[in-house]
């Protein structure tokens, strides 16, 4: 809210608009005309929350006053008052004849009460909106980007009223909470007598450095089903697959190293590797795998240390690596002396016989990473890596320096789910349900005028919309729909008409109606 010292004498309320409802939807929030706050205060709070959650990034331009008034069904004076408050809070800046822009985080500090402004907010608003009524205005509105961080934050700020088409997780109602509760009780029961209700002491101390022994044995059996020859001694657990990927990167790489990545590929991995100081070498990814000629040329020119890839049910395309391509990738890795980090996050949704590089290579030059967030629960941060014997101690050391150990209670509960066959049966049910959802989503997408760039498979569809999906993502975000625009899946963030959809969360006709409306705008 605006500081008292900078507030106008009377709060400005929007005049009645006959056609407007009593409550105005604004994404995940609602503007209520009868609320204690003015509409301007509610609208300012809406944008302030988006900025602080990094759904609107530094440099992003806010909608024009007229566009925001139309979008939120309020008067222009209400929008002016809301932007005035954002200026006073130091969240945005007004640029003469250009509009309002999110300020850089380093300078985004709330104004102290009574602080002196170089330019009064009202005057800054006037200067910023002067061009809106000028016939010379021709520059298009630059949409605030949706990036990897925004997608992650979207997981924690999703609109409860809408499914999130851009997220990479299953809907909560698809998960089996009863199975998880039973597994936890099963783990704790042997340590308790009928009169003992205390938590066993073994769960109050650090766990084993490499991870719970029981889980590592269960994982070794699971990997054997995929043809990956890993002993329990070759497996190290982590706080989720993302943590496992980070451990491997820190253990094998140093800042400045070159890393081959799929293009398109997982946006979070690009951001993480860049943050660690690595040089990304994008390899075009097709239906059957990477462009082998491009990989060969990049390897010759840059001597990469690592290739990070998702062989099965690739994110974002849903495609899986062909057997012939897999053998050629391994040949190039041997020829150019780089290791391969295989991310098998979606293993539970894929056929066991799908070609995996780690199975073909026998864990000699490859490292396998997976987890359980996608199939059990995102909050159960249990992941693991399986590596060649000569790398295991190095990876354990990196884990110890970063997090010490991982929670034994959750690891043993996951082991129970594996040992009892509960996880396999649950995964079979999810795969069947996902197949039906995929069929419905594909029909809706095609009816909305989209086409699939790769054959639909697994959790994700790689959809060509025919228009700039970054603009689509911006427009639909205010309607409460979080999209995953194609640009975030390219290391260079190039413009894209593609978007990733989650088949489990795109069966709602309301989304496709909103999509068609935004695309035609």
Residue ranges and their predicted role:
Residues 366-445, 451-453:
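PLP-dependent aminotransferase class I/II
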Residues 387, 463-467, 503-505:
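Short beta-strand-to-loop capping motifs
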Residues 479-500:
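Conserved PLP cofactor-binding pocket of PLP-dependent enzymes
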